[in-house]
């Protein structure tokens, strides 16, 4: 635990109270109380963690900023990984081909766009 450093009477010139609080020299053994108003807000507050440019990386994946990619990009990458194969007729994959991502399908259905 870190305590605040209080100047001894020999370090400070006589007649000056360090922070302007009365009674500080009367009880030097008490640690000063920290209040949220006294803490300067500089990128980090008294609550929570500091998330600005927080790096997250593992041995496998070095640090890269997370960026949202389009579904089309992911589909293209996924399709390039394996050998191209034709979908089997009658399976759910065959009927779903070329219809976009699930989120877009759900959004279209909710809008009630019927012809």
Swiss-Prot record:
Residues 24-38 have a biased composition (Basic and acidic residues). The keyword Transferase does not apply. Pfam families: Protamine_P2. Keywords: Chromosome, Developmental protein, Differentiation, DNA condensation, DNA-binding, Nucleosome core, Nucleus, Phosphoprotein, Spermatogenesis. Residues 44-79, 102-115 have a biased composition (Basic residues). GO terms for cellular component: nucleosome; nucleus. One of its GO terms (biological process) is spermatid development. Protamines substitute for histones in the chromatin of sperm during the haploid phase of spermatogenesis. They compact sperm DNA into a highly condensed, stable and inactive complex. Belongs to the protamine P2 family. This is Protamine-2. It comes from Bos taurus.
């Amino acid at each position: 635990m870190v305590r605040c450093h209080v100047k001894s009477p020999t370090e400070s010139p006589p007649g000056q109270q360090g922070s302007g609080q009365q009674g500080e020299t009367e009880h030097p053994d008490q640690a000063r109380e920290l209040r949220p108003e006294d803490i300067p807000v500089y990128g980090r507050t008294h609550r929570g963690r500091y998330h600005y440019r927080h790096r997250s990386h593992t041995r496998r994946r070095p640090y890269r900023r997370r960026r949202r990619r389009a579904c089309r990009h992911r589909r293209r990458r996924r399709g390039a990984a394996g050998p191209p194969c034709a979908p089997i007729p009658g399976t759910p994959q065959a009927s779903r081909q070329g219809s976009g991502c699930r989120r877009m399908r759900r959004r279209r259905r909710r809008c009630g766009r019927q012809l």
